[in-house]
Amino acid sequence: MIISIAAIVVTLSILVTFYTSSPRSEFLPEPKGSSLEFIATRLEVPWSIDVDSKGRIFFTERVGRVNMIDASGKVLNLFSKDVAKVGEAGMLGLALDPEFESNGYIYIYYTYSSNEGLFNRVSRVKIDNGLIREDILIDRIPAAEIHNGGRIKFGPDGRLYVATGDANNPMLAQDLSSLAGKILRLNKDGSIPDDNPFPNSYVYSYGHRNVQGLAWNPINKMLYATEHGPIANDELNIIKPGANYGWPYERCSEAKVYEQSLLCYAVSIAPSGATFATDGKYKGILFFATLRGEHVEMVTLDVSDPTKVVKMENFLSGLGRVRDVLYHDGYLYIATSNRDGRGIPSIEDDRIVRVRLG
């Protein structure tokens, strides 16, 4: 059941953290000028959020649904797919075409089951007069019950970036012939860009365990990615074309043989969706969701040197597991993940909430 409810103002938290995360807590004092609204409740593991120029909110639910919340707050199911509902698999990433208002294209990443096992794919979907047309762009991405990646985002260059997991087979991350454990880059029609770092390959970077968040700094257009580590060693990385991020040979590039992480967390927080504020007083600040950490992390970078972190703060606590965050037009949109089998859901979970950044 999906319901939309009226805005409820609750509190936020601003609390400094250092490579650790606090346990689930009650809401803390609200920063001046900020408020939080419940946009939709009783969802089934919302996984990815996007917002169009009209303010309509699009999101996936892992059970196989793609939904929209219109400007009046009404939740509509646009379409559903028969996805593999095992472990962390299912309907995962979603991205609207940069020209969505004119072409209506929605890009999705989901897991399916075949006679040969589990696979992930990236498709482009258009709804036209009630008919759903799906064009498969990339297929047979290795999948498993865990480590499916799944985040898809359009970069400032107009290319679609796809985060894949190692499909619980760590060595695939180092295999350039495999699509697993990578960040992929493709044109909107599914073709390979001529300027990709490896000839005739979707691979943009490799050596990844399970990337869950992608975000571009609006100041310098650099790509940042969040990644789950083993036990601990969760990472925030700056992604460079053709770079090797070391998995499974290194954790957080301990020996500095591979590309070094910007942040390495000694305690597991399970970082997920990421976003930069693109305007206002928060411009250039990175926000990312944490599942095990159960908060939204806020990272302030050095303006003159974006490879240096100035400050990390716990921006929002009290919602439980957080799967995705998205900044749009002065608001931070947040999806919880308390019904994913690892949380403690309340009757109103899962939720999509919206925070106005004051």
Question: Can you say where each PLM-predicted feature lies in the sequence?
Answer:
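Asp-box/WD-like beta-propeller blade repeats and closely related beta-sheet repeat scaffolds
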Residues: 119-153
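Conserved beta-strand position repeated across blades of beta-propeller domains
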Residues: 47-50, 95, 153, 215, ...
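Blade-loop segments of beta-propeller domains
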Residues: 74-98
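Surface loop/turn motifs at the tips and blade-to-blade linkers of beta-strand repeat domains
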Residues: 38-44, 79-86, 137-144, 202-207, ...
